[in-house]
Structures are given as structure tokens and as C-alpha cells.
Amino acid sequence: MAHYFVGDVQGCFAELKRLLAEVDFNPSRDELWAVGDLVARGPDSLATLRYFQSLGDAGKTVLGNHDLHLLALHGKLKRDKPSDNLAPLLNAPDIASLIDWLRQQPLMRELPEHKVIMTHAGVPPQWSLDVLRQESQLVSQALKQSDYLEALISQMYSDTAERWDPSAIGLNRLRFCINALTRMRYLYVDGHLDFDCKQPPEDCSNPQLRPWFEFTSALRQSHTLVFGHWAALMGKVNDPKLKALDTGCCWGEYLTLWHLEKDQKITQKKLKKG
């Protein structure tokens, strides 16, 4: 059995299929783990979601910011942008089934026997594994409620929940978890989230900002963290316990697959149209 982890697919289904064929992926034997953002911008978000849904227990994903945005679009809480290429998905006959499947997915997954943790954007450095589990579970519980659109999705868009407060309750607590696990790139030196800078660290001109993974973290001492979201990194982090897998396929770059057991990365260049 092999465990394969894939970066932000974002509708780049042809590239995903190329990678899986290259490694002879077999869902009856292997598992495919995705760092989230299965949809948006790429040409085939519909096929991507259908494929992961069809994998059953052989497919594991976490929610990314674009996946959560899809829930808002389907709930008519946001307006679709043509550049996201989501119209075929939103108008698909099985959209209700796909949305229901998507909102059952968590914000974090772990592979305890390998001490691997996967989220979309990373893990706040001040969080322990127990806190990560707890906060992720609170969001998952809210997403599974029948009123999830009104109670959570309609109110999750906020840049105000940028600081971890273990005494927070209600929406602010859920918002921080969503912001941290699906949007985080940089933190200010005092530990609160920045939502603006997307550049790679070498190009960041604000001396008050540091990448989240440069802060001391007890969790990262004991576990390998797999994440995506930050395409500008192009997979380059100087820590063997960090696996940055978003390499910008939807922007014309690469889709990256990481074979856990071999600690090997395989890449597929964005395919040309036609």
C-alpha cells in the first residue's frame, strides 16, 4: 500500500490523471490524499470532485479556501466569477450530492502510524495536536448541521479573527480556525495572521512578517506537516518535516504528487489546451 499526497488540484484533472498513471495508482491498494482546493480556476473542477467522491475510503481530502467558497456559491451567498471556471460544476445534475460530500470533509487529517498531518494552509505554531484536532472538529460539526449556510458559511468571511484566543466562543473561534487552516501564509512577529502578503519569503518586504513555518512549533518537531495553498513557494521549504505541495498548476506551472513511503516528489507540467 502506498500513500500519495497531491497539491492543489484546482480542477486540473488531466494533470492529476497523468500523475496517477505514472505511479500506477490503484485505489483498491493505495490511498490518495489531497491538500484541498480541489476546485476553481482549472478547466475541470466537476471531474475532479466526481473522481474524489468515487474513490471512497481510498481518497482523503481536507477543505481549502476554494472548496469553502464553492459551498458559498452553491448556497447563493456569493456570485460566481467566470475566471473560476465553476459554472459546469454548479450546474451539474449531481451538484447536490457533490456538495453534501464536500461538506463532510474535515479541515485536518492525520496518518498516526507515519506521524503525518495534512491541512490546506498549515498549522498555527502555537497549536498542539490536541488543539488542532479539537478546533478542526468544531468546524466540521458546524458544516454538518442543516443550517450550515446561515450559521457558518454566510459569516465565515472575516479578516477580524486573526489572533488565536483559546477563550473565544462561537463564530470567532470557528473563523480563526478556518482562517488559519485554509488562508494562512504569514504571521506577524507577535503571532497574529496576515491576510495580504502572498509573495515568497525572499520577496516579502515587510520586516514584521514571517512565514508561519518559521515560528517555533512543538508539533512540527514530532510530525511531518503536509500543506498546499501557497503556490509562490513552489514547494521550496528548508525543512524535511514540511511538505509544501502547491506548485501552481492552475497558473501554468506544475501539479506535485508526494509518495510518502519513498519520500519522493513527482511533478506534471500544466498541459497545453488542445
UniProtKB/Swiss-Prot annotation:
Pfam families: Metallophos
A GO biological process held by the record: RNA decapping
Record flagged with keyword Cell wall biogenesis/degradation: no
Reactions catalysed, as given in the entry: P(1),P(4)-bis(5'-adenosyl) tetraphosphate + H2O = 2 ADP + 2 H(+)
Keyword Hydrolase: yes
Domain of life: Bacteria
Molecular function as annotated in GO: bis(5'-nucleosyl)-tetraphosphatase (symmetrical) activity; phosphatase activity
Keywords carried by this UniProt record: Hydrolase
Enzyme class: hydrolase
SUPFAM superfamilies: Metallo-dependent phosphatases
GO cellular component: cytoplasm
Free-text function comment from the UniProt entry: Hydrolyzes diadenosine 5',5'''-P1,P4-tetraphosphate to yield ADP.
NCBIfam families linked to this entry: apaH (TIGR00668), PRK00166.1 (NF001204)
Similarity comment text for this entry: Belongs to the Ap4A hydrolase family.
Name of the protein this chain belongs to: Bis(5'-nucleosyl)-tetraphosphatase, symmetrical
Organism of origin: Shewanella sp. (strain MR-7)
Taxonomic path: Bacteria, Pseudomonadati, Pseudomonadota, Gammaproteobacteria, Alteromonadales
Annotated gene: apaH
